[in-house]
């Protein structure tokens, strides 16, 4: 049985947001407080000076690396490998239940 695609809405600073949109940023370091899984979608919402700019972009998680696997840290962090999706691709991905 397949699981439903989870969508995680996250705040992101403009310089990182722009790098994701341009395809230059393909990983995201995050505290693992949401149980991120391969196939989940990140809804990246650009925030500047504490205010949502209205810009949003999606990316699908292609790999989850627990940071504790490579270094000892006191909290649970993960390095998420991501593949940016256009808004239309993101919609199709979610509707298809994560099928590529």
Swiss-Prot record:
Protein family membership: To phage P2 uncharacterized 12.9 kDa protein in gpA 3'region.
Alphabetical keyword list: Transposable element
Pfam families reported in the protein's UniProt record: DUF3850
Name the UniProt record assigns to this protein: Protein ORFd in retron Ec67
Domain of life: Bacteria
SUPFAM superfamilies for this protein: PUA domain-like
């Amino acid at each position: 049985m397949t699981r439903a695609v989870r969508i995680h809405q996250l705040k992101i600073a403009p310089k990182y947001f722009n790098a994701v949109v341009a395809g230059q940023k393909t990983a995201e370091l995050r505290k693992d407080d949401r149980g991120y899984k391969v196939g989940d979608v990140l809804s990246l919402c650009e925030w500047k000076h504490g205010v949502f700019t209205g810009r949003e972009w999606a990316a699908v998680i292609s790999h989850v690396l627990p940071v504790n696997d490579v270094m000892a840290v006191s909290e649970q962090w993960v390095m998420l490998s991501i593949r940016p999706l256009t808004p239309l691709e993101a919609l199709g991905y979610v509707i298809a239940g994560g099928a590529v």
